[in-house]
């Protein structure tokens, strides 16, 4: 009698384990993977090709002329003879990542050489940018220029990068290094929106050795 009970118990246990296994397998099979998101909780565009950016490297930079909040114009033509760092970003809406990078660039002694110009390119109206300075006063130390209607960002293929939180409309978190002859030597797009001063300094060091 006990043997019959033990056999029945074993059979029941096997059936239960098998049923649980089927439920787990079925659940994992039907599970939809959550999309990768950036630090702002926005989906990262995974099908974005870096080809348009790579095609700009070692070619003459698109012409630009951008003004800071005081109306001073910074143009590619007038900056010939200097190495240029352009940091294309979303500006006001990209807090704190883009703001932190803008401040980091402004405070870095390695970029205060007279042969180097660092421009943080935002798409906000100049009057609106004052709100950011009020919230983070260190931003006043940076050279921020304003890209009306994102026209220059578009010329540099900055509106369809993996870092763009508003794909096709606004830039994200992308760096461009232009040499003294106006040729693009380095482009880096970062969906993680980290600080990249060391990488930029290394790229400028390469230019000084050429």
Give the role of each language-model region.
Residues 1-60, 210:
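N-terminal targeting signals for export/organelle localization
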Residues 96-155:
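Structural microenvironment flanking redox-active thiols in thiol-disulfide oxidoreductases
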Residues 167-210:
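Thiol-/selenol-based redox modules, centered on thioredoxin-like
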